[in-house]
A protein has these predicted regions:
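An acidic/histidine-cluster motif and surrounding catalytic segment
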Residues: 1-65, 69-187
Length: 187
């Protein structure tokens, strides 16, 4: 679909995510929950956070895709969104369908239905960074319309998460995933 992506080396538990979070002023209590492994979840959030910082520093619009993001349709070249927009089809649980084609308020869930594919502008990245200093948590849940009422999503979703493994969730966190089955790996 003509999307050329760069590669970002993720923050992993081996890189001491608690120290990195402390250096950025990010509280860690929101990452201690029943669905994910603490250090892995924190590391994933910090990877996204680092890209938000780069977005602000570069003063450029960014598209962030996780390893399991698969493009199934074209993303419009000029997408008229405000600050942050999800491109990803919900990857777990039930979801609502947006009411119109194109850019919509975040409708499928109250939070991003997975953080596997989204775009953001420097102004949106700045707001995410600032809010993370108060109540950070798992990336998709952090991107919640109660925190950021301006979040949007594009429909029909041009990106799907086609995951066969997780390095973040515990078994309980995988049960609602659309691709979860007997062969799904928790690494």
């Amino acid at each position: 679909f003509g999307v050329v992506m760069g590669h970002f080396s993720a923050i992993t538990p081996k890189k001491d995510p608690e120290q990195i979070a402390a250096s950025k002023g990010i509280p860690i209590k929101g990452f201690k929950e029943v669905y994910s492994r603490f250090e892995n979840c924190l590391s994933a959030f910090l990877s996204h956070h680092t890209l938000w910082e780069k977005c602000v520093e570069d003063n450029e619009e960014y598209m962030i895709c996780e390893h399991d993001a698969v493009f199934v349709n074209t993303v419009p070249l000029f997408l008229a969104y405000d600050k942050v927009i999800s491109l990803g089809k919900p990857s777990y649980g039930k979801a609502n369908l947006p009411q119109s084609l194109g850019v919509n308020p975040l409708t499928s869930k109250a939070y991003f239905p997975g953080a596997h594919a989204y775009m953001l502008k420097p102004s949106g990245a700045r707001e995410l960074i600032d809010r993370a200093k108060f109540d950070a948590g798992p990336t998709d849940i952090f991107l919640h319309r109660d925190r950021f009422p301006w979040l949007q999503e594009y429909y029909p979703w041009p990106v799907e998460a086609r995951d066969t493994f997780t390095t973040i969730q515990k078994t309980k966190g995988c049960l609602a995933k659309h691709y979860y089955n007997d062969e799904y790996k928790i690494i």
